[in-house]
Amino acid sequence: MNDKNTLKGTTTVGITCKDGVVFATERRASMGNLIAHKATDKIFKIDEHIAATIAGSVADAQSLMKYLKAEAALYRMRNSEKISIEAAAALAANILHSSRFYPFIVQTLLGGVDENGAKIYSLDPSGGMIPDKFVSTGSGSPVAYGVLEDRYSDELYVDEAVDVAIRAIKSAMERDTYSGNGILVATVTEEEGFRMLSEEEIQKRIENLN
């Protein structure tokens, strides 16, 4: 199986909140019309205060995530402090841009919380870096954006935004054939740092939405 062809059909969502950020994805990896994997991890912990999502090639995405994790850890050791969200996003953008002639086939959302507050950046394969209050990537993003546009507010807190993110991913899964097989949700707050929600917690929230 050629990993370059997997994970093309994906839906990811990122939301900035007053007290942190929320990331959500579905779990299906596709290869053309074939469902290649049904339990794909698409949210990664880069550091205690930074998370990222992936859409694109499995091999490229995993390589980029490992690179960013290593650089964040190295920065912490060298400087005795955490890398800022903007600096981590700029690092990812530089990695992507330097490889633009043999690009990473990946679109990444990277965000977290630092002394400057909660931030999320969208990064494309050529190294473009755009800050967003809310953003979605992948084949299901047009559907997800409909939910985000309707329900996003600058006054959202993480607990509320989790429900918005789940609703956006759930809607995309219902309309996009390349998205499905469950939902992953992670939050990053100043108090708790990175936290991945359990399947039970996500399922309970889905039931409450219904």
Curated annotation (Swiss-Prot):
Location relative to the cell: Cytoplasm
Q: Which organism is it from?
A: Methanothermobacter thermautotrophicus (strain ATCC 29096 / DSM 1053 / JCM 10044 / NBRC 100330 / Delta H)
The EC category is hydrolase
Asked if the keyword Cytoplasm belongs to this entry, the reply reads yes
Q: EC number(s)?
A: 3.4.25.1
Subunit:
The 20S proteasome core is composed of 14 alpha and 14 beta subunits that assemble into four stacked heptameric rings, resulting in a barrel-shaped structure. The two inner rings, each composed of seven catalytic beta subunits, are sandwiched by two outer rings, each composed of seven alpha subunits. The catalytic chamber with the active sites is on the inside of the barrel. Has a gated structure, the ends of the cylinder being occluded by the N-termini of the alpha-subunits. Is capped at one or both ends by the proteasome regulatory ATPase, PAN.
Q: Briefly describe activity regulation.
A: The formation of the proteasomal ATPase PAN-20S proteasome complex, via the docking of the C-termini of PAN into the intersubunit pockets in the alpha-rings, triggers opening of the gate for substrate entry. Interconversion between the open-gate and close-gate conformations leads to a dynamic regulation of the 20S proteasome proteolysis activity.
Name of the protein in question: Proteasome subunit beta
Q: Which GO terms describe its molecular function?
A: threonine-type endopeptidase activity
